[in-house]
Amino acid sequence: MPPTHNEFMRTDVPMQPMYEQTAQRLLRQRIVFLGQQVDDEIANRIVGELLLLSAEDRERDITLYINSPGGSVTAGMAIYDVMQYIPNDVRTVGIGLAASMGQMLLCAGTRGKRYALPHTRIMMHQPSGGIGGTASDIRILADQLLYVKKMFLERISLHTGQPVEQIEKDADRDRWFTAQEALEYGFIDEVLTNTPDVTGGRS
């Protein structure tokens, strides 16, 4: 028996947002999408999806699409660490904008499988944060900023092959890259021009 008009109009059944429906369909193709600022909530979702896909098949590739202005360092590094932790190759594909932590995650994909679409913009800069409070508080926060900066420089150097000193100089202020410039710098391995270049789950 087909549903009645009243059943269509029921409000006691929560409707799944269209974005969530799309995300679930992408997940079935082993595609994870980061399309916003990185915070704890989105990081926990992406970490969970990476772990789930790895548990389902420890050999097939996972593809992470990135369109993000950056965000929380701790949240972003949770994603980063899981990308390195799971045995699967993680393809990264930059679309639109990969800035700050988005840039870090883009270059952290498996070597040879890091991509960007032609008009993607990539931005690198040093970590920043507000400092205030007592002298002791300021000293503690300053030490943490120095630690994060050193970690970022070392990680970016590892993934790009650029010397730490060069990255430190380039990241002193916002440094913008086109997709081609990002390729030359070592953030990515290829600029994609059509969809057959990268697929969802094949290794």
UniProtKB/Swiss-Prot annotation:
One of its GO terms (molecular function) is ATPase binding. Pfam families: CLP_protease (PF00574). It is found in: Cytoplasm. Its EC number is 3.4.21.92. It is an enzyme of class 3 (hydrolase). One of its GO terms (biological process) is protein quality control for misfolded or incompletely synthesized proteins. The active site is at S100 (nucleophile), H125. It catalyses: Hydrolysis of proteins to small peptides in the presence of ATP and magnesium. alpha-casein is the usual test substrate. In the absence of ATP, only oligopeptides shorter than five residues are hydrolyzed (such as succinyl-Leu-Tyr-|-NHMec, and Leu-Tyr-Leu-|-Tyr-Trp, in which cleavage of the -Tyr-|-Leu- and -Tyr-|-Trp bonds also occurs). CDD domains: S14_ClpP_2 (cd07017). Keywords: Cytoplasm, Hydrolase, Protease, Serine protease. GO terms for cellular component: cytoplasm; endopeptidase Clp complex. Cleaves peptides in various proteins in a process that requires ATP hydrolysis. Has a chymotrypsin-like activity. Plays a major role in the degradation of misfolded proteins. Fourteen ClpP subunits assemble into 2 heptameric rings which stack back to back to give a disk-like structure with a central cavity, resembling the structure of eukaryotic proteasomes. Belongs to the peptidase S14 family. PANTHER family: ATP-DEPENDENT CLP PROTEASE PROTEOLYTIC SUBUNIT. This is ATP-dependent Clp protease proteolytic subunit 2. It comes from Thermobifida fusca (strain YX).
